[in-house]
């Protein structure tokens, strides 16, 4: 444990100071401490010093320097979670500045796809929203046992998975919400299925309580829709008048109105004459048919 030249601290002491200042959130003081370090290559390659430099670069918005540090050095797995957060948050901030608005879940997913984690801070294991599958497996197993872990259990789970206590709490909260939504959807589907099975419809699709078209038609009303078009359009037998001539009696518009002083025809005489012209030929023809 030799002292660094012209500095007065050992390498282990420098690493300890960096860790203490990071955990205390004294980023400005940490930056000044790093600036005061002597130009010793062995010291500047220390992992605690490199991590401290990455934290200072992030808080100062010097993302290019941050990316360079994270990509150029191989970090230990116990530092991966912290450095991965710096990598992703820096890219999120840059994307938000370009777009001029905060990123949603889809926007953050696209950023992660565009800027994947470098292997220097990632062991290559498949991740889902920055959760390793191994960590998710531990959380799922605990959830099956107890969906409501206590604060102490959340801290233990955080240590076992490498996540923060907040991440563990959010995972359980989101999982409970998804399960409640799935249960509500299943209940709704079951209720719809039961209501369909009790629907008062017979096999032909008609309501048992309803009535057919024949029942709706009054008995004294002729069913014009059932008449054959061919029958209506076929010419009448010789000697019989056309069906059109046997239609409804002429309306008021067909009866001539006498003009005062004009000597017009009597409407009553016209009506009797029209009736005779229709009925007399029919009587003669019916007599001929009967003979």
Swiss-Prot record:
Family recorded in the similarity comment: Belongs to the SIX/Sine oculis homeobox family.
Location(s) in or outside the cell: Nucleus
Cited InterPro entries: HD, Homeobox_CS, Homeodomain-like_sf, SIX1_SD
UniProt-reported outcome of changing residue 276 to N: In a renal hypodysplasia patient
PANTHER family membership: HOMEOBOX PROTEIN SIX (PTHR10390), HOMEOBOX PROTEIN SIX2 (PTHR10390:SF61)
Gene3D superfamilies (UniProt xref): Homeodomain-like
Entry keyword set: Developmental protein, DNA-binding, Homeobox, Nucleus
Biased composition regions of type Pro residues, renumbered to the chain: 249-259
Protein name: Homeobox protein SIX2
